[in-house]
């Protein structure tokens, strides 16, 4: 029989309020440090930047906006933040949630209304995931708005685990070592995209969003299934992290610790220059293998 008194059981099973507050403060401090470090490492924010924060209503983008607001309060340089959401006219989308939240915290915002949902559902065959085309159309709409409004940076809520998952997606399905960089210039050269959550784990974001009680909008309103390939990679990474804690962190660090001479990309390292003698060039191996070498006397 359990001889523990009820009051004693409550003490041992319920975290004390002070302890909960301390844990929340530690979590917020860790996220601020990681986001600040990413901003500094990659030069994400400059003086007088006009930053468009893409806000979907999910845990990642809420955390991104919250962190940038906290860091701006103590930043050594001034910069502007504007939250922008794309209303894609998905059925059941709660249009009131973001305006009410953003107004309550005093953040300037704009809602772009563009019916990409109808286009995607019409073009994509039934049973196929809508995510890829939906993402491209969403990106196009956001980039177009950023250009018309003169934003200098576009901030996205991708985190460390997203970056690692994208690396493996490209490795497994596209035979290339590439991922999701913390900072990039768009293909058309008009936009600089930043990912301030590049050092933050998804686990911490989930805990932080829960602690802050953000009004989360689900991302499955369209009824589309998650991309199967990405889902498989996610399952793999979660299994690794469970069996080998910190493995995802190690992989993320490796993405910034490249050794071109230890790989096989000829565009990154001049392997042909590694002849037996420094001033003796190697023969044209491609021509030789094709049988076109001028002095090839083989029968």
Curated annotation (Swiss-Prot):
Pfam families in UniProt: ATP_bind_3
Catalysed reaction, written as an equation: cytidine(32) in tRNA + S-sulfanyl-L-cysteinyl-[cysteine desulfurase] + AH2 + ATP = 2-thiocytidine(32) in tRNA + L-cysteinyl-[cysteine desulfurase] + A + AMP + diphosphate + H(+)
EC number: 2.8.1.-
Protein's name according to its UniProt entry: tRNA-cytidine(32) 2-sulfurtransferase
Residues involved in [4Fe-4S] cluster binding: 131, 134, 222
Cofactor: Mg(2+); [4Fe-4S] cluster
Motif PP-loop motif location, chain numbering: 56-61
Additional remarks: The thiolation reaction likely consists of two steps: a first activation step by ATP to form an adenylated intermediate of the target base of tRNA, and a second nucleophilic substitution step of the sulfur (S) atom supplied by the hydrosulfide attached to the Fe-S cluster.
Subunit structure: Homodimer.
GO CC field: cytoplasm
Top EC class for this record: transferase
Pathway membership, UniProt: tRNA modification
Subcellular localization, as worded in the UniProt entry: Cytoplasm
Role of this protein: Catalyzes the ATP-dependent 2-thiolation of cytidine in position 32 of tRNA, to form 2-thiocytidine (s(2)C32). The sulfur atoms are provided by the cysteine/cysteine desulfurase (IscS) system.
Cofactor: record remark: Binds 1 [4Fe-4S] cluster per subunit. The cluster is chelated by three Cys residues, the fourth Fe has a free coordination site that may bind a sulfur atom transferred from the persulfide of IscS.
Keywords: 4Fe-4S, ATP-binding, Cytoplasm, Iron, Iron-sulfur, Magnesium, Metal-binding, Nucleotide-binding, RNA-binding, Transferase, tRNA processing, tRNA-binding
Origin species: Xylella fastidiosa (strain M12)
GO BP term (any one): tRNA thio-modification
Similarity comment text for this entry: Belongs to the TtcA family.
GO molecular function: 4 iron, 4 sulfur cluster binding; ATP binding; magnesium ion binding; sulfurtransferase activity; tRNA binding
HAMAP family: TtcA
């Amino acid at each position: 029989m359990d001889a523990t008194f009820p009051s004693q059981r409550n003490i041992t099973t319920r975290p004390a309020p002070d302890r909960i507050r301390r844990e929340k403060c530690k979590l917020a401090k860790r996220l601020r440090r990681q986001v600040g470090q990413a901003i500094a490492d990659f030069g994400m924010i400059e003086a007088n930047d006009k930053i468009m924060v893409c806000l979907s209503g999910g845990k990642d983008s809420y955390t991104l906006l919250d962190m940038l607001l906290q860091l701006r309060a103590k930043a050594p340089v001034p910069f502007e933040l504007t939250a922008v959401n794309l209303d894609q006219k998905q059925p059941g989308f709660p249009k009131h949630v973001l305006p009410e939240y953003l107004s309550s915290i005093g953040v300037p915002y704009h809602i772009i209304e563009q019916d990409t949902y109808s286009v995607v559902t019409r073009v994509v065959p039934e049973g196929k995931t809508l995510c890829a085309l939906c993402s491209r159309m969403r990106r196009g709409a956001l980039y177009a708005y950023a250009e018309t409004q003169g934003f200098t940076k576009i901030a996205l809520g991708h985190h460390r685990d997203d970056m690692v998952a994208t690396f493996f997606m490209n490795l497994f399905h596209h035979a290339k070592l590439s991922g999701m960089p913390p900072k990039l210039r768009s293909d058309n050269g008009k936009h600089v995209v930043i990912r301030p959550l590049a050092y933050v784990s998804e686990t911490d974001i989930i805990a932080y969003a829960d602690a802050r009680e953000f009004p989360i909008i689900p991302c499955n309103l369209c009824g589309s299934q998650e991309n199967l390939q990405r889902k498989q990679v996610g399952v793999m990474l979660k299994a690794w992290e469970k069996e080998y804690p910190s493995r995802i962190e190690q992989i993320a660090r490796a993405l910034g610790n490249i050794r071109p001479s230890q790989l096989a990309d000829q565009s990154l390292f001049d392997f042909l220059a590694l002849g037996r003698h420094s001033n003796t060039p190697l023969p044209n191996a491609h021509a030789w293998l094709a049988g076109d070498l001028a002095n090839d006397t083989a029968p």
